[in-house]
């Protein structure tokens, strides 16, 4: 693992041994990168590089618009996703990818809760990511992102990884990958 800081964010890089592995950017609330990477390895996931970003202002960095608090006695969401996306694309990604071996065969973004919302939002704002994982998007937000995901002509679902199908969905393939890594 390699750790660095940029723009007040802590970036932890868990590198793949290969030179053309996919790279996944995971925004975390409590610095869970190590646990996620270890769980993926324990589940025999194909090799990948994980870049976990922590020290986020969760209710600001992950949300595209202002919104009232989700729960009692919590802060409102203040719509800073565009600013954070600029930091991610102009600072974090170039810095992280200088630290790995080779060139990633594809780049993905993942997140849970509000970071899941950010992951979905980001694929409509930049073409840097060809894969997205969203876990438990916040239902309290009234947002246009949900309809955009299912209605946007350039962002139709093209595949679900065979490993995800087999271990999580317990279902046969419904989508076929358009691109594969060499490994």
Predicted regions and their residues:
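Short glycine-enriched nucleophile-adjacent loop
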Residues: 116-126
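Serine-hydrolase catalytic machinery in alpha/beta-hydrolase-like enzymes
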Residues: 20-99
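Active-site loop->helix "elbow" adjoining a glycine-rich segment at hydrolase catalytic centers
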Residues: 84, 113-116
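Alpha/beta-hydrolase fold nucleophile elbow
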Residues: 100-112
